[in-house]
Amino acid sequence: MEKEKQEALIRLDAIEKESKELRKIIENAGKSKNIMERVIDLATAIIEIGNKDEEVLEYNKLVNAGIADHILAGQELVIISKALNEGKTPTTFYYPYFNLTKKPGSGFFFDGYGSWRVGGSVASARLTLLNKELALYQGKQFEQIHYRHKVKN
């Protein structure tokens, strides 16, 4: 009986070890891809930063409270920016900007990016990005969320 118990514990330890290794493989699956390939919508941004992240928890509170859509869109952009920045805090901030007049039809479209530099101290702006490529990507990929945040009531 004691021998069977020890064998069972050994098997259990092996299963736990394999489970941890498998979990690590699953968690790192796709991590070698560029962040712009991994974050393609709000759902993948949440997967990237985790559903226990403070910004995701705040978003869920807003959704459950029935908050206005433009506020939800703002929080969605916070989550997306955080995911695209991969946990890094920029010292030069890049952000997408939009034009409200040139495009026939909708009157709102992505129109490039801007940037500014912070000297000396660490600063945080929740909707800014690490580089121009991320700003360009976010502006194009998430244009409709920006529209909901900035224009649509």
Where are these regions (language model features)?
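Short, low-complexity, charged amphipathic interaction modules
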Residues: M1-V39
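The feature represents the first ordered module of a protein
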Residues: A29-K102
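Short aromatic-glycine-(Arg/Gly/Cys) micro-motifs in beta-strand/loop hairpins
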Residues: T89-S124
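A short, charged, amphipathic alpha-helix used as a generic interaction element across diverse proteins
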Residues: L130-Y147
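Subunit-assembly interface segments of extracellular/virion macromolecular structures
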Residues: H149-K152
